[in-house]
Regions:
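Solvent-exposed loop/turn segments connecting transmembrane beta-strands
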Residues: 30-39, 61-71, 97-107, 127-137, ...
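Detector for outer-membrane/organellar transmembrane beta-barrel domains
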Residues: 105-166
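Repeated loop/turn-to-beta-strand initiation elements of outer-membrane beta-barrel proteins
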Residues: 17-19, 51-55, 82-92, 118-123, ...
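Cleavable N-terminal export/targeting peptides
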Residues: 1-18, 224
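Short glycine/proline- and aromatic-enriched beta-strand/turn motifs that initiate or cap beta-hairpins
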Residues: 14-63
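Outer-membrane beta-barrel "beta-signal"
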Residues: 117, 180-190, 210-224
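Membrane-embedded beta-strands of outer-membrane beta-barrel proteins
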Residues: 43-45, 73-75, 92, 110-112, ...
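Transmembrane beta-strands of outer-membrane beta-barrel pores
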Residues: 23-29, 59-63, 79, 94-100, ...
Length: 224
């Protein structure tokens, strides 16, 4: 979510601030569910400076008990390619994810991305994915296209590669996830319906079967 906001703000010629408040029927992360949390509420804020630096924070909460699911923070830098049209560029960032109170799953990722017309291609490296011993590399392509003033379509494909496992542990297999959806702008609101899931490879065996299934996601958000 924070990286997606950076694509929009990175074209700013002056300092810009953007905040977003939204809700979703279910929380999904890289093609999988994150637990039996039900509907969730998200708030985020981003600041982009003319020199190319940007930063953002976001939080995700359960609706049934207002408990924090996770919090994220990102600091990055974006730029343009002088020889290419202005809608081409690049960005790099550090991203930190915090889960609930104990912090056992907290992890940091480094990101490098290529930005183009209606798409962003990014690679993410985590030395301790979800606080564990495995390092991972995640490559994702996100794209969107406006059909008219109201309707837009969007899609995503991501590939997660695990490094060597800890001693005497089997290596987690790679996997590929996809997402496709359609959105509508209704006044100040953006309403989206999407379907995501794992299309190749397998999730870790310790995850609940429900989290490994594909799912529909209905969401709505407003920017301010």
């Amino acid at each position: 979510v924070l990286a997606a906001g950076a694509v929009v703000l990175s074209s700013a010629a002056q300092a810009q601030f953007a905040g977003t408040l939204g809700a979703a029927s279910v929380d999904r992360y890289r093609g999988m569910g994150t637990g039996d949390d039900g509907a969730v509420v998200r708030a985020s804020a981003m600041l982009d400076l003319p020199v190319g630096a940007y930063g953002g924070i976001s939080g995700l909460w359960r609706t049934h008990d207002a408990g924090l699911v996770r919090a994220e923070a990102m600091l990055g830098w974006s730029g343009r390619f002088d020889a290419l049209p202005p809608d081409w560029g690049w960005d790099a960032a550090l991203h930190r994810t915090h889960y609930d109170a104990n912090g056992d799953k907290d992890f940091t990722e480094a990101m490098l991305g290529l930005l183009g017309p209606d798409f962003a291609l990014r690679g993410w490296f985590a030395p301790h994915y979800f606080g564990g011993y495995s390092r991972t590399f995640y490559t994702e392509l996100n794209a969107s296209h406006a059909l008219d003033a109201r309707w837009h379509v969007f899609g995503h494909v991501g590939w997660l590669h695990y490094g060597p496992a800890a001693d005497y542990q089997p290596r987690t297999p790679d996997r590929t996830d996809t997402l496709a959806g359609i959105g509508a702008t209704l006044g100040d609101w953006d309403v989206q319906l999407a379907r995501d899931g794992i299309v190749a490879g397998h999730a870790r065996g310790g995850l609940d079967a429900r989290d490994r299934r594909a799912a529909w996601i209905l969401s709505a958000s407003v920017a301010f």
